[in-house]
Amino acid sequence: MKIRVGFGFDVHQLVEGRDLWMGGIKIEHSKGLLGHSDADVLLHAVCDALLGAANMRDIGYHFPDTSAETYGMDSKIILRDTIALIATKGYHLVNIDATICAERPKMNPHIPAMKACMAQICGCDEDDISIKATTTEKLGFTGREEGISAYAVCLIEK
């Protein structure tokens, strides 16, 4: 058995006129995240963690923001394809531990739905996915509600 750990991070700017997607679910809010895809920072951080653990570069390499094919892409597809990519090297997900950093909207009420969505895509139990939410106590770009960031650590094995 071989186990590996990966770390991922993502951040996107909050803007008017976009839907807010987090952990694969749509969250009602006056603003959404700006990006080439649906800009789901949680799923993007998780994908980077998975790819990093498998030593398969990063999300931008596999799903470039310069490609018409990835424009407006649903990040659930990116996560599904990332799980398939690490499987080509014989790896499967053991667990994910992630943190969302946002002042508003409050993420905690949505965490059970995020976990259910992600577990279905990853083919694991909801108990294998930990999602936490925090703020920056009004400090920095997140505190000024200019953007949302997410961090993720994952364990994979073969």
Region roles according to the model:
Residues 1-3, 157-158:
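N-terminal charge/polar-biased segments
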Residues 2-112, 122:
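RNase III-family endoribonuclease catalytic core
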Residues 111-115, 145:
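Short, low-complexity, polybasic intrinsically disordered segments
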Residues 118:
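Glycine-rich, mobile lid/loop segments that gate access to catalytic sites or pores
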Residues 125-128:
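Short acidic capping loops at alpha-helix termini that bridge into adjacent secondary structure
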Residues 131-135:
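Pyridoxal 5′-phosphate
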Residues 138-140:
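Short acidic, Gly/Pro-enriched loop/turn segments at secondary-structure junctions
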Residues 142-158:
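C-terminal edge-of-domain segments
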